[in-house]
């Protein structure tokens, strides 16, 4: 390869990092992180970023374009209900910028039956498609992945990413995002498997990781609807359903993930099934009993913790 061809190749490969570091992309990511963290504590680093954004933006751009940007360690924040791996405001902004550009590029490549991706209609669209078609099919199979985010294999994920991304600086950032370091109250650990929850880039990575499953279902010609790691298959015959289940198991084995034993079901559609918190039958949708049970349990915990009436009201309003 002569020098001119090599330079042209490098220029093409570097277009992606230029788009991520572009002023419009960083401004959109900045607006997003400001909105998401507008109610954070006054000691939160979001306020430092907001105060110094005019000076910090060109510095971030320069670091990205030189391949010198590195993500800091994540902190673990413990709440009464969960543990949250927390990115600093600046890292969250950069991850959002990467997500904005990659989503634009990958959206046409990802299955139209994957509904959790931005612009696909979300949970309501997934439920609507299942509800509209369930009456035309006799059998269903639904499942999801046990501990999906924590189970994602970095090597298998990046093998898929590298089919779409050639920019070495972006690939380096994505490896840095995956092989992160977590600070849990002074205990430090390196992460070698799984992706981060609560990260703006993770839903897109979660969509890409199961793309082989999406493609396999499309080839079978069954009705298939996926929302993140939760999906349902509708089939006209037992033979068609068995073939789909066999394909699902084969793809999950290749991706080194396992079905959740408590969220896997199959049978006749007339008996109904639980999907995304709703009970689905040919007659329509209603909130699943398990969803109501979780709501009651949450309200009980809030009462035990001495939550104010206004906080409980906010939770119930959000739940509805």
Which residues does each PLM region occupy?
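Short, charged/polar, Gly/Pro-enriched secondary-structure boundary elements
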Residues: 240-244, 274-276, 282
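A short local loop/turn or secondary-structure capping micro-motif enriched for an aromatic residue
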Residues: 94, 150-151, 243, 284-285, ...
